[in-house]
Amino acid sequence: MAKNRNLVFFLGVLASFTLSSFPVTVSGEPPILFTFGDSSYDVGNTKFFSSEFDPATTWPYGDSIDDPSGRWSDGHIVPDFVGRLIGHREPIPPVLDPKADLSRGASFAIAGAVVLGSQSTTASMNFGQQISKFLELHKQWTDKERAEAIYMVNIGAEDYLNFAKAHPNANTVEQLTQVAHVLQRIPRELTSLYRAGGARKFAVQNLGPLGCLPIVRQEFKTGENCMEMVNFMVKTHNERLSRLLVAITVPLLYRGFRYSLFDFNGEILRRINEPSLHGYTDTTTSCCGTGSRNAYGCGYSNVHAKLCSYQKSFLFFDGRHNTEKTDEEVANLFYSGDKHVVSPMNIKDLVGKAATDLLAQEI
């Protein structure tokens, strides 16, 4: 059934490209795709990494595609749709799957991933460990393939959610210190990909309004409001991340470094604030779960979680992850949106840029 669903998944893109072809690199082939991040980009690495129970491998996860594959959604997620849009017939596989064909790329993202160290030595890989895993394998692809590849990154949410749980009464200075620590590490890892891995094209998704997640509203009992402390850290993070990416492109040391920065935060807030305009009936409660915001326990057999009757009417599938509908909209904007939502270029334009300076320069 899953194979049939993947065929349907690919055929779906053909209708959207009846008047145009897939974008290709200067070599004439769809670019290889690599993804890094947390559960929002995890396509199944968690189930191979840990022997602990992974709820994303059980129903109702994957309900919309009849395949609970380890994605934290009712169906496909952002990297799946982006991969399809750039011409891949099948979703990019999890790198930890021993049977995976990595010739088209791989997902290094895993649930629970953080930037600052690892909150658990047994249940996740932090951002740096994901980069290290890529560097272990990078000779499987040629210099040219790695230079023309797209490197999708979505990381940092767990750092701020964990901080809020541990320090719910943190003052502004402490919050800004946390942001500074996170943003000291991210550029270091990106430039490691550039120098040692030969990466040139980065597609970075900024952080959504984490304080508005159903699980945060439920756990912190914020009622109809979002948790302002978390959203303040996220807002500061996103503003500084934008400036850091601009700064990386300036020095001659990083010649050929190109990027797309997608305003995920803005798009989610627009949907929360104007649900009917985007076809939603609920943007504050989860489709699957239990509790005041239906935000806890999805996928756990010992929890009497409820499942909504129509996932496409919900923004969130579980307490902190989007529905497939939401992720498809996000991917389409990331791929071909204008500069109000993705800058300085979208992924479609990024793919078409010639990759220069294929070998990283040594200091």
Curated annotation (Swiss-Prot):
GO CC annotation terms, alphabetical: extracellular region; plant-type vacuole
EC number annotated for this UniProt entry: 3.1.1.-
Entry's Gene Ontology molecular function annotations: hydrolase activity, acting on ester bonds
UniProt GO BP: lipid catabolic process
Domain of life, source organism: Eukaryota
Residue numbers annotated as active site: S39, D318, H321
Record keywords: Hydrolase, Lipid degradation, Lipid metabolism, Secreted, Signal
Coiled-coil residue windows: none
Name of the protein in its database record: GDSL esterase/lipase At3g14220
